[in-house]
Amino acid sequence: MNHYSFSSLIRALIPLSLVIVSAVWQPAALADTRHIIVDSGDSALSKEAARQSKEQWDSTRSLRNKVNNRVEKEFDKTEKSIDGREKCNASYNVNAYWENTTDRCLDRRTGRPVAP
């Protein structure tokens, strides 16, 4: 009979222990709450950041244009120099030579510019 009471005690304690564990676990689960804030992105802070970004973009625009124009100008100058050298070297005028320092095609006898 003692054996029977011990097994019935175990059978009663297992569900009771599960209830106690779940009760202890519940406040911890309730304490961990999540807040979700839905924002359309039209807050004053985001508008100010967008305005500042646009202002910075506009202020650097003229500088970017100047840099791009300078790069294009240097490229055109180099391209013109290369084309002139090729024309001068391919010229049938035997007295024509290319001077690198001035980027011009000159006559050997007179030193004047020659049109190749």
UniProtKB/Swiss-Prot annotation:
Keyword set includes Nucleus: no
Signal peptide: 1-31
Keywords on record: Signal
InterPro entries for the chain: DUF1283 (IPR009700)
Family from the record: Belongs to the UPF0482 family.
Protein name: UPF0482 protein ECA2253
Organismal lineage: Bacteria, Pseudomonadati, Pseudomonadota, Gammaproteobacteria, Enterobacterales
